């Protein structure tokens, strides 16, 4: 079975590292965070329930 040269392992490691970083960045930036204003409005709307006992 042939052995790989150290530069082959290094290039393989660099390729896998770059693809991992690329997919991680794509996953991070694919979601669009909601603005804080909409979250504050949602909280105020849910907390303003008037219970009539």
Curated annotation (Swiss-Prot):
Chief location bin: mitochondrion
GO biological process: proton motive force-driven ATP synthesis
Keyword line: ATP synthesis, CF(0), Hydrogen ion transport, Ion transport, Membrane, Mitochondrion, Transmembrane, Transmembrane helix, Transport
UniProt-annotated location(s): Mitochondrion membrane
Membrane topology, record value: Single-pass membrane protein
One Gene Ontology term of the molecular function aspect: proton transmembrane transporter activity
Membrane-spanning residues: 6-26
InterPro entries noted in UniProt: ATP8_metazoa
Complexes and interactors: F-type ATPases have 2 components, CF(1) - the catalytic core - and CF(0) - the membrane proton channel.
Family according to the record: Belongs to the ATPase protein 8 family.
Function: Mitochondrial membrane ATP synthase (F(1)F(0) ATP synthase or Complex V) produces ATP from ADP in the presence of a proton gradient across the membrane which is generated by electron transport complexes of the respiratory chain. F-type ATPases consist of two structural domains, F(1) - containing the extramembraneous catalytic core and F(0) - containing the membrane proton channel, linked together by a central stalk and a peripheral stalk. During catalysis, ATP synthesis in the catalytic domain of F(1) is coupled via a rotary mechanism of the central stalk subunits to proton translocation.
The protein's name: ATP synthase protein 8
Species, as recorded: Ceratitis capitata (Mediterranean fruit fly)
Gene name of this polypeptide: mt:ATPase8
